[in-house]
Amino acid sequence: KYANTINTDPNFNVLSYISSHDTKLFFGDYQDTALQRRAANSFMLLPGGVQIYYGDESGRDLMKDGGVFDQAVRSDMNWSELASGEKAELVKHWQKLGEFRKGHPAIAAGSHKKISDKPYAFVRQKDGDKVMVVFAGRKS
């Protein structure tokens, strides 16, 4: 049904996100940079548009001052954590995924064909661009 909707509904359009100013921050819930990387891998391969809320790409956490929830998700960008280390590498990972997505319009706007369930694999194709994605599992 998923592929059928993507492939045949001319009005199909979706905008996906993992965090927003109205939700909890993904990193704030899980505190796991490796999980944030895996989420980025899946997220940046979704069809349609993707909305990256500031800090999704850098593991930005909620404010620690006990403020109101709405303000906690609007905390300052975690610039001081991005000079080096795990969070800097996370940003580089998101940048690489963004460049890949930008270079392959089939990811966001291509026809979708599932190849297998285990490992999960699919092909997306748009005009001359064709991408095959295989989720082989996660690195422990």
For the regions a protein language model found, what residue spans apply to each?
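Aromatic- and carboxylate-lined catalytic core of secreted/periplasmic carbohydrate-active enzymes
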Residues: 3-4, 73-115
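Substrate-binding cleft/loops of secretory-pathway carbohydrate-active enzymes
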Residues: 1, 61-71
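Short helix/strand-capping turn motifs
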Residues: 49-53, 67-75
